[in-house]
Every structure is written in C-alpha cells, then in structure tokens.
C-alpha cells in the first residue's frame, strides 16, 4: 500500500529525486572547498620557502653560493611542508657588490605551480601559479 503524504499526495521517489538533483551541487561545492584549502596551504608553504631562501642567501659569502643555498633551502622548505611543485627560485644578488659598511639586501623569489587538475570541478584551472618574494638584509660588516 502506498504511503500518503499529509496533504494526501504520494511521496514515493522524492528522496531519490532530491539526491539526484543535490549530489552534483554538493560535489561541486566540496571540490571548491578542497581547491581553496590546497591553495591556502600551498601559499603558506611557498611564502615560507621564499623567506628561508632569502635568509640562506643573505648569510652566503658569494653570489654563486647564495643562489645555490637559496634553491636548496626553498626545496627543503617545500618538501618539509609536503608540497611537490618543482620550484623556480631566483635570487637578486646585485647588492653583494655594495662596499662593506653600507646596508645591502638580497631578494629571493619562489614560483610554484600547484596542481588542481585532479579535482574534477568545472571551470577550475588545471594549476595555479604561486609567487612569493622576500628580501633579507646582508650583514653590513661582513666581507662579501
């Protein structure tokens, strides 16, 4: 015997219909939340990597070792945070030529592509490029 709703009409199949209509919407929202979370976590990791890279470059004695130390430090920071993005690290070492006793800085920029293609969300790009820059002072009294 069919179940009758309070208003006297049939109530059969409404739950299945609601599920069919709402499931794609809920999955879309869930995908957006996951993408936002992944991007937010990656932003923090890339920012920390840029800071670490600039600090390591600032304690190096030559521009060549500064570049190598910055790249190594950025990769280690991203690996520590669980982000696998093959970073591009650029270091501005132009101020290594500033005479001792004068203030100088070194700037590190880290670029990282965060993959989003594994999330099946319509309209979402396949990846997002994150870029962070940090400037660290060079010791004005240390020979460069």
Q: What are these model-derived regions, one by one?
A:
Residues 1-72:
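Alpha-helical assembly-interface signal, strongest on the long, hydrophobic N-terminal helix that forms
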Residues 2-4, 59, 63-144:
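Short, conserved structural patches
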């Amino acid at each position: 015997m069919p179940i009758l709703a309070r208003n006297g009409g049939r109530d059969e199949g409404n739950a299945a219909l609601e599920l069919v209509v709402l499931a794609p919407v809920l999955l879309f929202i869930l995908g957006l939340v996951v993408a936002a979370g992944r991007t937010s976590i990656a932003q923090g990791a890339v920012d920390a990597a840029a800071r670490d890279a600039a600090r390591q470059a600032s304690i190096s004695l030559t521009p060549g070792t500064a570049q190598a130390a910055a790249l190594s430090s950025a990769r280690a920071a991203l690996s520590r945070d669980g982000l696998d993005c093959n970073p591009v690290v650029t270091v501005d070492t132009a101020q290594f030529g500033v005479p001792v006793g004068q203030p100088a800085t070194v700037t590190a920029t880290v670029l990282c592509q965060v993959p989003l293609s594994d999330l099946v969300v319509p309209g979402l790009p396949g990846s997002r490029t994150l870029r962070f820059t940090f400037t660290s002072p060079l010791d004005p009294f240390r020979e460069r």
